[in-house]
Amino acid sequence: MDVKEIDKYIKRYILAPYRLRILEARQDYDLAIKGKCSKKSIDEINSLYDYIEKIESIINSDDLKKIEIFRLDNKTVLEEYNMTKHQAWNYRKRVRSKILEAINAGELSELK
């Protein structure tokens, strides 16, 4: 699995929920433009975009790219990488802890 594939899986499992929030916020934004919604939705959209950019910059850091697996399908992990379910789970935890470190360091204050 190359770096692009690793990034794809990281984005799917970590970023996807926030992208969904952006889609919902965009719908509110359309209403706001028509005068049917508050400015709060517009501010939320902007903060979500900023948040995703920050997350992506953390995900693209070299130390995360050195880890060779983020495909979390257990059978594939076992067959292609000889990783157990437990090892794959530990990798997931490492990625999430890296993001939590960034949140705690104030780099991602939106989620604090």
Kindly label every feature range from the protein language model.
Residues 72-87:
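Helix-turn-helix DNA-binding module
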Residues 1-58, 107-112:
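N-terminal interaction/assembly modules
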Residues 57-76:
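Short amphipathic alpha helix immediately N-terminal
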Residues 88-106:
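DNA major-groove recognition helices of helix-turn-helix
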